[in-house]
C-alpha cells in the first residue's frame, strides 16, 4: 500500500474557498442606477403663472438635456436642449420663447397658458453616450379672482343680481303709482261739474226742502153779507186767510 496522501499546508481544503466565494457573491449586490423623475412646481398652476418642471435624482455625468412635449422623446417635438460643456440653451421646433433649461436639467415655463398643459419628457445623455428619459405632467387651470374662492365669487354675483331685481321692482312700483295717480286726476279734471238749479247751490250741497203748498184760489176777502149784524163780520181774522 502506498503512503497516505498528505493534507494541504495550513489545514485548509480547496472546497472551503469555494464556499466562502459563493457566500460573498450571495450577499453582494452590484450598484444600480437610480431612475430620475420629473416633478411640477406647483403641481397645478393658474393661467399666467410660472411653473418649474424639476428634474430629480439627476446624475452628475450628464452631458446634455433635451426636453420634448409628449409622453416620449421619440417622435415628439423638441422644445429646448442644454449642453453642459458649452452651458448654452438650444431652442427646438416647439420653442415659444418662454422656456428655459437650467444646468441641472429643470425646465422653467413662464406665463403658462391652457394650451401648455400636458405631458413633457426629459431625455438625458451621459458621458458614455447612454440615453435615459422620464416624463412629467403639467396641469393648468383658469385664473379666478385673486384672493376670493369660487364660493365667494358666486355669492357676490348672486347678491348683485338680487339687488338689481329689487331696484327694478321698486322703479316699476313707483312708475305704476305715479301713472295711476295721474290718471285719476285727469279723470277728475275731465268730468263736468253737476248742473245746479236756479236759486240752489250745487247738487252735493243742496238740501231737501218740503214741497211748497199749491197756491189756493184767491178769494175775495169780502163776501155777501148773510147776516145783517155787522159785528159778526168784524170778528173775522183776515190775516190768517192771507197767510194760508
UniProtKB/Swiss-Prot annotation:
Annotated InterPro entries: CEA_cell_adhesion (IPR050831), Ig-like_dom (IPR007110), Ig-like_dom_sf (IPR036179), Ig-like_fold (IPR013783), Ig_V-set (IPR013106)
Ranges for domain Ig-like V-type: 36-139
Subunit: Interacts through its phosphorylated ITAM domain with the SH2 domain-containing cytoplasmic proteins involved in signaling processes during phagocytosis.
Effect recorded for residue 222 to F: No internalization of bacteria
Source species: Homo sapiens
PANTHER family linked: CARCINOEMBRYONIC ANTIGEN-RELATED CELL ADHESION MOLECULE 19, CARCINOEMBRYONIC ANTIGEN-RELATED CELL ADHESION MOLECULE 4
Note: To study the function of the orphan receptor CEACAM4 chimeric proteins containing the extracellular bacteria-binding domain of CEACAM3 and the transmembrane and cytoplasmic part of CEACAM4 has been used.
Protein name per the record: Cell adhesion molecule CEACAM4
Gene3D superfamilies referenced in this protein's UniProt entry, alphabetically: Immunoglobulins (2.60.40.10)
Tissue: Granulocytes.
Amino acid at each position: 500500500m502506498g503512503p497516505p496522501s498528505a493534507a494541504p499546508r495550513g489545514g485548509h481544503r480547496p472546497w472551503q474557498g469555494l464556499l466562502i466565494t459563493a457566500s460573498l457573491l450571495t450577499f453582494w449586490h452590484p450598484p444600480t442606477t437610480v431612475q430620475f423623475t420629473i416633478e411640477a412646481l406647483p403641481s397645478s398652476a393658474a393661467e399666467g403663472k410660472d411653473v418649474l418642471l424639476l428634474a430629480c435624482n439627476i446624475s452628475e455625468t450628464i452631458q446634455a438635456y433635451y426636453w420634448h412635449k409628449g409622453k416620449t422623446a421619440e417622435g415628439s417635438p423638441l422644445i429646448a436642449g442644454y449642453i453642459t460643456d458649452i452651458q448654452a440653451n438650444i431652442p427646438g421646433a416647439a420653442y415659444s420663447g418662454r422656456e428655459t433649461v437650467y444646468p441641472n436639467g429643470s425646465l422653467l415655463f413662464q406665463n403658462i397658458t391652457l394650451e401648455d398643459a400636458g405631458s413633457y419628457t426629459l431625455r438625458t445623455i451621459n458621458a458614455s453616450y447612454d440615453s435615459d428619459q422620464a416624463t412629467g405632467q403639467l396641469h393648468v387651470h383658469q385664473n379666478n379672482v385673486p384672493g376670493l374662492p369660487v364660493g365667494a365669487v358666486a355669492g357676490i354675483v348672486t347678491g348683485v343680481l338680487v339687488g338689481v331685481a329689487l331696484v327694478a321692482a321698486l322703479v316699476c312700483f313707483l312708475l305704476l303709482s305715479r301713472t295711476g295717480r295721474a290718471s285719476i286726476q285727469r279723470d277728475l279734471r275731465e268730468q263736468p261739474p253737476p248742473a245746479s238749479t236756479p236759486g240752489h247751490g250745487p247738487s252735493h250741497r243742496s238740501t231737501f226742502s218740503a214741497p211748497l203748498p199749491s197756491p189756493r184760489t184767491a178769494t175775495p176777502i169780502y163776501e155777501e153779507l148773510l147776516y145783517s149784524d155787522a159785528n159778526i163780520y168784524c170778528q173775522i181774522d183776515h190775516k190768517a186767510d192771507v197767510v194760508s
